[in-house]
Amino acid sequence: MFELSISRLTFHIFKRNMIKKLFTLFICLLSLAMTFTSCSDEAVDVENVNKQTILVFFPWTGGTSSTGLKDYLESNVDSMCAGIVDKKGLTNARVLVFFTEKYNESTLYDLQYDAASKTVNRVPIKKYEGNSHCTAEGFAALLNDVRQNAEALNYSLIIGVHGCGWTYASDWVNYPYMARPKTGSTEKGNDRNTIVSTTTSDHFSGIQFGNDPNRPVTRFFGSVSLSDNAIDISTLAEGIKLSGLKMQYILFDACYMGNVETAYELKDVTNFLISSSSEVMGEGIPYKTIWSYLCSSAPNYSSAVSGIVNFYKNSDIPYCNMAAIDCRQIDKLASIMKEINSKYTLASTVPLDSIQPLDGFSPNLFYDLSVYVDSLYPSGYLKDQFTSQLKLTIKAAEHTDEAYTALTYPYGSFKVKNYCGLSISDPSQHSVAIKGREKTGWWKATH
């Protein structure tokens, strides 16, 4: 009996102590959990988090002794800064500018608004040598530098360069000089001091520099003088993939980037594509005018497109077309196009000049996508499917009555009666189209 009583007492004491210890442990764990929860809440404070980082990518567009579009690109940065000032700063946003000062020297800048002086400071972050940014691995490294210095919920990319659409630099003869040689005299390459006859020449660059009002400058991606500084769209897409990022939008301030082949190539690395299907004038995008539409956690694509085209409509160089493409819809468009291509081909009786051209090449490289599909005369069912999907794909598209080209001699404009927002090179007889289009993802998905 006595022995049993002692055992029970010991048990009750042990039980009471265990309850105390367990209760103490519970309180400690609860406090620890509350501490971590508190820290986590601070880390995801949606009011203070950086919602958008825009990378402005302005690489080299000239040669070893010519500066290309450098002066225009510097003006574009000034225009962005003016837009930031008008908006009274950057609210939950960052803007980093990659600017190439010389063909082999570049700097990554942080645009920082000074509220006291109402100015924008360009704070250097990192210097780069060479042109590794023109490779997929190099561009991915640049994007990683951007993320490390300005991490955000969303990333966007503005590219200001010369451009030649989906085409591959390696498919050009003297890229992209073999444009439209005609009788007369033109500049050789980008050197205005070297004049050559184009009676039999295949070396007309079509890229004009200078302040002659009768010969406006256009932004004919990368450099057209240095092949090592040219970037294929597939390289750009691969670089973005390697970085692990996906862009909210990519804006091409460059010629001829608004084609369905380019949109298809970029569909997995961006939600939207803002681009022109024709040549973009040297002044480029009026960033100050449309900055509030671009620098936003929810960009206003329709207003951005309208702002760009209206700027040129009211200028003394009224030549512009621009569109905002929802790249998330491109796969569905390709699926319908594949069915159309399986049943219809362009009849030999359809003259190519009856399909709206959007370029100055000879033969033409880029044709309006909608007019091309109309020219295939698909059945009502397929045509309706295509039209409905095209409306979902092209969020906004506007154009002036004419487009300008520096690829003809003499230089001039041509009528644009139809512009859906995307071009296509399927019907082109240009040698570069014949060489390259079957290599594109779009062709493989639709044929």
Task: Name every feature range the model reports, one short phrase each.
Residues F2, I6, I19, L29-V56:
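Bacterial Sec-dependent N-terminal signal peptides
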Residues F14-F26, S276:
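Bacterial N-terminal signal peptides that target proteins for export
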Residues S40-L153:
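N-terminal extension/subdomain marker
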Residues E47, T186-H447:
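Terminal, contiguous helix-loop blocks that mediate binding/assembly
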Residues T53-F58, R94-F99, S156-I159, Q248-F252, ...:
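Structural recognition of the beta-strand scaffold that forms the well-ordered cores
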Residues W60-T64, E101-E105, N131, V161-T167, ...:
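Solvent-exposed loop/turn segments at secondary-structure junctions
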Residues T100-P124, N154, I158-S223:
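Surface-exposed loop and adjacent secondary-structure segments within mature catalytic domains
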